[in-house]
């Protein structure tokens, strides 16, 4: 949904006719020192307390000076040096950019122009990447583990607001300093966010939500401010000029608000339920899609100026373009075309039958994102043929588990165990064909298992790459540790097992429900945590005795520095604190195991 900086609202709309509201040329009103920046030092504590960041949000920046409306795409471009190799794909030549960045896993969700030579791309994998024309050098940062759906670039170009969601009940908007990769503030919402835009020269952030209120306005510190005197409905687009704020709601209501007086200046009714509404022609026209038609509406009156038949519309125009530009599917399956009003390019097809999910314009090019996570640069020639260049696509490896090594680290990904040097450089494969998602280093190989139910524990030898089954768990595994040649396995619905790795035989089993984690600290003594009033317990393998330790908190995880020093997290729900506890075990007298316990770190929860 659209957002932009609008500089052509009339100075005194109440005294002018509706047809004169948008007669002034567009101007970009540079942001003064934003309230966001000035409030940051005063509100750093509250910002840090707020937790982590993302559909269609239009270009934030208008030209720095008055300029007539123009079209930035579908015009002949100056010749540039390109890679000679290419593959013709149904009327399109596909080449690859020199600087290649990884693809977005799960697909692209949003492309947003930040200036006439830079743009942001966001994906379902939580990655946000800034690309700079003409080499498209990427600057990438993962700001969330969930999907990014909306973005809005601040007029100072240093800050970006994003909406992140898991598609169910997690909805959060956060603002980031892109240059330092620091979060400035974040706010959770109970309903999904449908639009995101900076208004009033970047002083406020407008968040349109699918709630009864319809829109929430935040100041530079993330605090809610009152801007609308009445609920405008579900707001799909918000823009502002030097004095007025314009909002478009899905009900078709156009509302003008004087933000200095917080009063409604004018209300209009126009086409309702427009998808991806955006402003063009320096704010004079509102563009949106509905029912196989692209509508061009006069912003000052709400009147429909033009309708264009369209099979669908993924808009790619800029704020100053005089005509709408969009990508639509062609008649043939997996084929696409570029539209500029009634004009159309030759049909083209993307590799891998990719589906276009987002688009924007940079200089004379159209940048599109796909459901395969690949970005493409589209350029139309005089013959209407479209030249295609892939901007990313390197394969990424996602590690399911990582452990430190003497030099570098081991990690497990895509069924293989790798080693990466601390100095960087290429990683090397140690063991292939691994069936599991978790592992522990063990002597000349690794112990591998999966986090699911009834998992097999395998010993994978590094030199021979042979896999040998050690043990099969009967229920979900919550904790695994190695002591010498003994493997300690904790199953919450079964108990604690100790398995001889070399022989593949279980040598000890403590049957109990609610075990959380366990650690063998001597040849005979196991320290374990369990749910209940006495969460800390010692198990003696040789005698079979159990020693419960009174602890007025919940114990989470146990780890040992050596055979005597044990660490665990203690969660006190009454006091609202979490402590990292260190204690020295007196294994000759297990009943005095907590004779030396101290809190190393205390965290308030």
UniProtKB/Swiss-Prot annotation:
UniProt xrefs under InterPro entries: Haem_d1_sf, WD40/YVTN_repeat-like_dom_sf
Region entry Disordered, spans: 22-93
Query: Biased composition, Low complexity: where in the chain?
Result: 46-57
Q: Which domain of life is it from?
A: Bacteria
Q: Which SUPFAM superfamilies match?
A: C-terminal (heme d1) domain of cytochrome cd1-nitrite reductase (SSF51004), Tricorn protease N-terminal domain (SSF69304)
Q: What is this protein called?
A: Uncharacterized protein TP_0598
Species this protein is from: Treponema pallidum (strain Nichols)
């Amino acid at each position: 949904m659209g957002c932009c900086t609008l500089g052509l609202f009339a100075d005194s709309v109440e005294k002018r006719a509706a047809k004169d509201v948008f007669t002034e040329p567009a101007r970009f009103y540079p942001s003064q020192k934003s309230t966001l920046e000035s409030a940051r030092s005063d509100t750093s504590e509250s910002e840090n307390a707020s937790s982590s960041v993302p559909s269609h949000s239009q270009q934030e920046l208008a030209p720095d000076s008055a300029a007539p409306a123009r079209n930035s795409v579908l015009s002949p471009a100056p010749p540039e040096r390109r890679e000679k190799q290419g593959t013709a794909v149904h009327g399109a030549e596909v080449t690859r950019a020199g600087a290649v960045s990884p693809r977005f896993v799960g697909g692209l969700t949003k492309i947003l122009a930040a200036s006439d030579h830079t743009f942001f791309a966001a994906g379902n994998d939580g990655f946000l990447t800034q690309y700079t024309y003409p080499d498209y050098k990427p600057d990438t940062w993962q700001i969330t583990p969930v999907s990014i759906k909306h973005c809005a670039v601040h007029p100072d170009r240093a800050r970006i607001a994003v909406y992140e969601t898991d598609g169910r009940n997690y909805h959060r908007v956060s603002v980031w300093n892109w240059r330092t990769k620091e979060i400035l503030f974040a706010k959770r919402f109970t309903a999904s966010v449908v639009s995101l835009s900076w208004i009033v020269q970047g002083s406020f952030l407008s968040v349109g939500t699918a709630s009864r209120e319809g829109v929430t306005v935040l100041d530079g510190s993330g605090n809610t401010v009152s801007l609308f005197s009445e609920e405008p409905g579900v707001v799909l687009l918000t823009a502002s000029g030097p004095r007025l704020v314009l909002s478009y709601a899905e009900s078709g209501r156009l509302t003008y608000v004087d933000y200095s007086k917080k009063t409604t200046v004018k209300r209009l009714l126009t086409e309702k339920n427009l998808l991806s509404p955006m402003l063009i022609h320096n704010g004079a026209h509102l563009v949106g899609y509905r029912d196989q038609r692209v509508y061009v509406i006069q912003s000052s009156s709400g009147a429909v100026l033009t309708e264009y038949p369209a099979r669908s519309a993924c808009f790619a125009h800029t704020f100053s373009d005089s005509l709408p530009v969009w990508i639509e599917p062609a008649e043939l399956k997996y084929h696409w075309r570029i539209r500029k009003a009634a004009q159309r390019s030759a049909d083209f097809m993307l590799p891998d039958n990719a589906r276009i999910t987002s688009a924007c314009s940079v200089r004379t090019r159209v940048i599109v994102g796909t459901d395969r996570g690949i970005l493409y640069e589209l350029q139309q020639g005089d013959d209407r043929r479209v030249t295609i260049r892939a901007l990313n696509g390197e394969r990424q490896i996602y590690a399911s588990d990582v452990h430190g090594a003497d030099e570098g680290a081991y990690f497990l990904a895509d069924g293989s165990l790798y080693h990466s040097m601390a100095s960087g450089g290429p990683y090397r494969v140690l063991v292939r064909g691994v069936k599991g998602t978790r592992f522990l280093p063990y002597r000349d190989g690794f112990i591998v298992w999966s986090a699911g139910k009834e998992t097999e524990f395998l010993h994978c030898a590094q030199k021979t790459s042979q896999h040998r089954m050690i043990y099969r768990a009967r229920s979900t595994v919550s904790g695994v540790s190695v002591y010498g040649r003994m493997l300690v396995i904790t199953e919450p619905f079964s108990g604690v097992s100790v398995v001889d790795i070399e022989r593949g035989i279980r040598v000890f089993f403590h049957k109990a429900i609610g075990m959380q984690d366990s650690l063998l600290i001597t040849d005979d003594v196991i320290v374990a945590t369990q749910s209940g009033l006495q969460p800390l317990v010692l198990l003696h393998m040789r005698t079979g005795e159990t020693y419960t330790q009174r602890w007025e908190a919940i114990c989470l995880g146990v780890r040992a520095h050596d055979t005597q020093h044990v660490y665990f997290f203690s969660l006190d729900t009454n006091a609202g604190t979490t402590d990292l506890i260190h204690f020295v075990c007196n294994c000759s007298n297990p009943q005095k195991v907590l004779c030396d316990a101290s809190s190393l770190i205390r965290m308030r929860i």
